[in-house]
């Protein structure tokens, strides 16, 4: 078989959704029906094969993205099952970066939930084509048509409905296939493995024809032949219609919508058909952009197994049997064991030992992998998440991933001297695995501080230290990761001069500091012309600003959302050095503090609360007492859905308070929204200087 024909038979997909929408249950059914496993693992029994960590089995949630491979209709499908909890959103981010397509799973009752919006935006960022699966159609309150409307209202998506549910809630038995215009009914006694086709129920014929017409109108626009047949009133073949839909999905014109109940074993096989029929193969995305290290130009890397080897490392983890495992997605060329490749980011080489295909935490050794493959490499020494591996004679760097800022901190202290050394090793490995986890030592207290995405994230990290590394630690109360920024533009001229008898130090910098929109981070630009400062000294200025902004201006918190433009300066032939310019930059930063209107920022969380009507007044009153603001209220069956924005500082222990207010009947979910200024009247009470 031609190599690129093999590529066309490959699908790299992710399963993504809000927590409890049924991602892992859907994946377990896929593995069962494709013959990858001979039994169905249930999440609620702690037996799901994709949830292999002890914490995942105990909590019934997915924490780490797990990879596996299965086969369907002659196609190989590489699947990554990702977490739905906001605290583990980094796992979704790095998975979507290397996937060609995604299946977005929605709860048929709740529809589009907060984390659904987050993962949808992440998929938009990486232009990942996707299909939607409306799950849990058997549950009380499930409403397929309302969920489709929510795709438009909440996500701005263009849904292309391919199926309609037959029956609702406990009477849900199958679907109407709008492509073939027939019904599909699943047999109860075969665990969903067998099903039969039939006529569309009479009471659904009109609705099926209505949605079939909508489907045709959207799909034929992408193919002249299909459009001509449509306007001539002639029949369009299913194969031509599928080709139109595939084109539209790959171009992100619309998202096909299917439905079912993974737990009740209905709807999964047509979902697999849709993955094969509509989601792109690696070679459907013909080129990816990369930076040519030699020329610093942007070049296109062709997606082909016949090209030079190029891969992106998207995850590092520690395996207790194999040691360090680095997951890579190969975009071009082939990789064989016992060869040497270049890490273009680190400008160092890595020796390739074992190449592994993963099924959750089970491993299969292979000797070669090629473009389109997602594999794990054992024993790499220097490669971390986001690094590019490539052929020795083809140094290129692929676009790196963006990782969210940690919003919560805890102090971690080893319980004994024996735990001290082990804790250092454990934390360095865990931080290497998880780019959304940070660590630093408080210079005043000497405490080790862990930074993470939320209480659950940090709780799981501490639990992993204990289980995997035998480290016992005392944990401090969670603290908010505040930030600082500036509100005014200011130009600073600073001269650093030091004379000590021998060679001295001299550097002069003129820097414009400007505030940037929220979420911009720190930006540095040099506008030096005419040799006012030699090129080799400019990185010292950037380094100095990077270092000092981390220790803050007001209360010791990192400074974000500002730009520093180096526009002039001076140097001395003998006394200037990179260090002198680094110190000058730090001096300029300190001078800027009192002139640029420095303020404190706090993380604001987007919170969705679902509560019975009778508790709504208490819940809203409590939101107001937490300095929160209610943005939206909706009716959902017999409950109220409240969307609010609340400072993270006021959310500690909220789960207990909400249970108490509602007698355990209300629930909530939250995720990071943005940083906002801390009101002046509460700064002194809420912030303690580091």
UniProtKB/Swiss-Prot annotation:
Keywords: Cytoplasm, Elongation factor, GTP-binding, Nucleotide-binding, Protein biosynthesis. GO terms for biological process: ribosome disassembly. CDD domains: EF-G, EFG_III, EFG_mtEFG1_IV, EFG_mtEFG_C, EFG_mtEFG_II. One of its GO terms (cellular component) is cytoplasm. GO terms for molecular function: GTP binding; GTPase activity; translation elongation factor activity. InterPro entries: EF-G-like_DII (IPR053905), EFG_II (IPR041095), EFG_III (IPR009022), EFG_III/V (IPR035647), EFG_IV (IPR047872), EFG_V (IPR035649), EFG_V-like (IPR000640), G_TR_CS (IPR031157). The keyword Cytoplasm applies. GTP binds at residues 17-24, 81-85, 135-138. It is found in: Cytoplasm. Signal peptide: none annotated. It comes from the Bacteria. Its main location: cytoplasm. The keyword Nucleotide-binding applies. Residues 8-283 form the tr-type G domain. PANTHER family: RIBOSOME-RELEASING FACTOR 2, MITOCHONDRIAL, TRANSLATION ELONGATION FACTOR G-RELATED. HAMAP family: EF_G_EF_2_B (MF_00054_B). Belongs to the TRAFAC class translation factor GTPase superfamily. Classic translation factor GTPase family. EF-G/EF-2 subfamily. Catalyzes the GTP-dependent ribosomal translocation step during translation elongation. During this step, the ribosome changes from the pre-translocational (PRE) to the post-translocational (POST) state as the newly formed A-site-bound peptidyl-tRNA and P-site-bound deacylated tRNA move to the P and E sites, respectively. Catalyzes the coordinated movement of the two tRNA molecules, the mRNA and conformational changes in the ribosome. This is Elongation factor G. The gene is fusA.
């Amino acid at each position: 078989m031609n190599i690129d024909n093999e590529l066309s038979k490959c699908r790299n997909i992710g399963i993504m959704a809000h927590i409890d929408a049924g991602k892992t249950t859907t994946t377990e059914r896929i593995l069962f029906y494709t013959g990858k496993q001979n039994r169905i693992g249930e999440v609620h029994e702690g037996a799901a094969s994709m949830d292999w960590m002890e914490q995942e089995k105990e909590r019934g949630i997915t924490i780490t993205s797990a990879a596996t491979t299965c086969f369907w209709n002659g196609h190989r499908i590489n699947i990554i099952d990702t977490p739905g909890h906001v605290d583990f959103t980094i796992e979704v981010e790095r998975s979507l970066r290397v996937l060609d397509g995604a299946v977005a799973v929605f709860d048929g009752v709740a529809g589009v939930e907060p984390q659904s919006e987050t993962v949808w935006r992440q998929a938009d960022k990486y232009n990942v084509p996707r299909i939607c699966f409306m799950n849990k159609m058997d549950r009380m309150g499930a409403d397929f048509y309302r969920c489709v409307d929510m795709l438009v209202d909440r996500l701005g998506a263009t849904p292309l409905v391919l199926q309609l549910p037959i029956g609702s809630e406990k009477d849900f038995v199958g679907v109407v296939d709008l492509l073939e215009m027939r019904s599909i009914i699943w047999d109860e006694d075969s665990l969903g493995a067998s099903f039969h086709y039939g006529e569309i129920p009479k009471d659904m014929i009109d609705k099926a024809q209505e949605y079939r017409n909508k489907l045709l109108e959207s799909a034929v626009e992408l193919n002249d032949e299909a459009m001509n047949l449509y306007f001539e009133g002639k029949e369009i073949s299913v194969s031509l219609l599928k080709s139109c839909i595939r084109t539209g999905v790959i171009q992100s014109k619309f998202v096909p919508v299917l439905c079912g109940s993974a737990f009740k074993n209905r709807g999964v096989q047509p979902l697999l058909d849709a993955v094969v029929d509509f989601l792109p193969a690696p070679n459907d995305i013909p080129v990816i952009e990369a930076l040519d290290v030699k020329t610093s130009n942007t070049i296109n890397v062709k997606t082909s197994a016949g090209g030079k080897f190029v891969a992106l490392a998207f995850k590092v983890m520690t395996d207790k049997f194999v040691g360090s495992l680095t997951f890579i997605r190969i975009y071009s060329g082939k990789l064989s064991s016992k060869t040497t490749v270049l890490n273009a980011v680190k400008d160092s080489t890595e020796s390739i030992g074992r190449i592994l295909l993963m099924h959750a935490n089970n491993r299969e050794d292979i000797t070669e992998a090629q473009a389109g493959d997602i594999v794990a490499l054992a024993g790499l020494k220097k490669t971390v998440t986001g690094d590019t591996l490539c052929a020795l004679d083809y140094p290129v760097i692929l676009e790196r991933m963006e990782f969210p800022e940690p919003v919560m901190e805890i102090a971690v202290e080893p319980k004994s001297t024996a735990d001290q050394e082990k804790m250092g090793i454990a934390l360095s490995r865990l931080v290497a695995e998880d780019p959304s986890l940070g660590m630093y030592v408080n210079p005043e207290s000497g405490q080790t501080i862990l930074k993470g995405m939320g209480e659950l994230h940090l709780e799981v990290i501490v639990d992993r230290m204990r289980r995997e590394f035998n480290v016992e630690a005392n944990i401090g109360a969670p603290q908010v990761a505040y930030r600082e920024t500036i509100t005014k533009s200011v130009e600073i001229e600073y001269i650093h001069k030091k004379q000590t008898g021998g060679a001295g130090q001299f550097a002069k910098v003129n820097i414009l500091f400007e505030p940037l929109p929220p979420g911009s981070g720190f930006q540095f630009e040099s506008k030096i012309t005419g040799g006012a400062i030699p090129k080799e000294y400019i990185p010292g200025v950037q380094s100095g600003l990077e270092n000092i902004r981390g220790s803050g201006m007001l209360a010791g918190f990192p400074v974000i959302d500002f730009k520093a433009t180096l526009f002039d300066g001076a140097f001395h032939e003998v006394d200037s050095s990179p260090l002198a310019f680094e110190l000058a930059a730090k001096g300029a930063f300190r001078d800027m503090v009192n002139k640029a209107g420095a303020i404190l920022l706090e993380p604001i969380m987007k919170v969705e609360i679902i509560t019975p009507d009778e508790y709504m007044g208490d819940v809203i009153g409590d939101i107001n007492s937490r300095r929160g603001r209610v943005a939206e209220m909706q009716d959902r069956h017999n409950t109220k859905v409240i969307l609010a924005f609340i400072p993270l500082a006021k959310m500690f222990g909220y789960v207990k308070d909400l249970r108490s207010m509602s007698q355990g009947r209300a629930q909530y979910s939250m995720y990071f929204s943005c940083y906002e200024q801390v009101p002046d009247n509460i700064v002194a009470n809420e912030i303690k200087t580091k």
